[in-house]
Amino acid sequence: MSAIQLVNQGRQTFRFDTFGDESFWGGTLMLHQAIEGAKLGGVGPGVSPKAALGVGLKVDVDALPANLIAALNHGKVNLDDPATTLALLQLNAVVGVTGFFNSSGTLQSVGIQCALCHSTVDNSMPDLCAGAIQPNPGTGCIGHRLDGWSNRDLNVGAIISLAPDLSVLANLLSTDQATVRTVLGTWGPGKFDAELVLDGKAFNPQQMTDGAVTGTNIPGATLIPPAFGLGGVNLHTWSGWGSVPHWNAFVANLEMHGKGRFWDPRLNNAAQFPIAAAHGFGDLPHIDPDSDVITSKLQALQFYQLAIPSPQPAAGSFNAAAASRGDALFSGKARCNNCHVEPLWTDAGWNLHTASEICIDDFQANRAPDQRYRTSPIGDLFTHFKGGFYHDGRFATLNDVVDHYNACLSLGLTASEKSDLIQYLLSLTFGPKNSTPQSGQMSSGSNEQ
């Protein structure tokens, strides 16, 4: 298979493959019934397009016929009617979600894809967000796909809570459905707790930053990271669970509930992962290769993720002269380059550090096998401003991040040096470094290839 064929196959998997998980999201949770609503054969009020956009779901404008686009632009489409949502699902236009329909036109089931969390759309139709959501800067509600961008508008907890039957999750967590819904309601936009079904720890009892308590009972959900800029990066996720294909297999099997084979004996550690150990998540039952619809797709999926181009900052989005001064600080006085090594923007090698090294609590680190935090690649920060920075979003702005490291590492940065450093951070993209930071060549573009 050629490289082009691998990219195309991986893109198809990333955007449209449910890995058979509709048997869970529809068959077990009955989420499709909540989407269509009682009037259309389901339960409850149903999910209108406006409600769907309000929880961060996106619509791919390239999947819409021209007459529908024209009607949308003229306000002639009822965005308050769940029937319109079903029509969009029939067009395969809802990013990251596939509807499976009966011959009568009612929903039979629903499944999700990688793109649900790791894609969004551009703001080419900005008026259609009105009354639904204020999207992450540079993105929209209905537009062209932006693969690899973290969907910081997506309220995963709210979406799961729509499901009529959460008994499987309640039983797994040894609690009741009401408690599960309460926990899901704490996540908020742009966050997901992948470890909850492994350890049952829904809240960080005491958040510590620079030696001070900065919060108590903080939700354990972490920010959804981008799925681009992964070339040359060793360990993936906020706490370095493993490589990109390891995490793809982990998520496809254990989080999306697709049909495949997964092996990670570290999950047999009952002291650290009591739920995972009790349910054999570290060694999923062997299945017939013809029934495994995940493993054969991991190669192309990783290949596509590595091929997703680095978005470029919008023209004028940072001060080039200040960024040039910040460049010198980054590799000098500020010592950022000690860990965020150019041009990977993470450590070249085993990219993990203890909580004490970065002056924060170890709650999230202790939920991963190595009990450390990964040095996050910091290219293209402009693509995910919403929700804050660090794994739990504890720092609202880049100013807060720089202030934190200034205190943690006793850097002695002046106000002007901090400002220059931030301008440099705003200029960073993945790939070969320009000799002089440019002020931006283009706004965000589609990853159509």
Where do the protein language model's features map onto the residues?
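Periplasmic c-type cytochrome electron-transfer domains
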Residues: 1-449
